[in-house]
């Protein structure tokens, strides 16, 4: 089962996301601020991070920057900041998608599935093995 980290300080939105993601078959953990997010990230393996921008302690851009220093785990930003400048900043930090609030839960669930599908295909392609006679080459 794939594991998703929700980083959202609005408890109503966090609970809504948690409920719908569990219903969709995902394991879910949640953080209320950037420091808690980094603590959970360092102690667990996540397949995807759903990240708000406006967070206490460390904002979502800062969290993304810290994560990208050590991992290419898929990140979807989910935020009320819908301006072009914020979206460009997120994309420059290599987020996989940038979704503005308010959002459609069914569309979000499908975008998460698409990002996870692409991520798993990339990982599978990265572990190819070529065999020739008695030689095996792990790519």
Predicted segments, located by residue:
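N-terminal/domain-start alpha-helical segments
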Residues: 1-122
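A structural micro-motif at secondary-structure boundaries
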Residues: 130-139
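Short flexible loop/turn segments at helix-to-beta-strand junctions
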Residues: 125-128
